[in-house]
Amino acid sequence: MKHIEYKPFFAALLALTVIGMAASVATLGVRADDNEAITFRTRLTGFGEVPPKLVEGSGTFSGELSADGQSMSWTLTWTGLTGPALVAHIHFGQPQNTGMPVVFFCNGGNRPAPCPDGPDHSGTLTGTFTAADVVAVPSQHVTAGDFAGFVKILRAHLGYANIHTMQFMGGEIRGQIRVGRGDEN
């Protein structure tokens, strides 16, 4: 029977794990590579909420980080809500968990109020996020104005967009934001 040396095997495995983790952390940087725009997207539905909601409403969010990493142009759309949108924002939270808002699309922060309400309780908002839009969330160690931190949250897939209504004050539709390049995601 052949004797196997486990120490070198586990040392190599540990080294590969550390290298892999370092590479993963390196991808959480803020800047786009060589002026290539980084996009963030999600589809909002009631199934994304915590707890999930069986509702007809849906929406989309898309954002594009500027080449210098200092701003993000964005569009948020929704339709079919149970009533007018009361507030819409991006939270810092994992899938299946909740967190606090870090930026607002409407009706909070320094965004216009109220949120638009069109036919079938629909709406579209466009704008640009900058450091001035990031609000403090002391319980999650987010500092007001920390745009680089906000982008790190999104790149780590720890941001979600959601829209609240009178019937669903905790949120009617939600989508976890993902990173994509170009038309991906």
Task: Locate the predicted segments by residue.
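Bacterial N-terminal signal peptides that target proteins for export
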Residues: 2-15
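Bacterial N-terminal signal peptides
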Residues: 12-24
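N-terminal leader/targeting pre-sequences
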Residues: 24-185
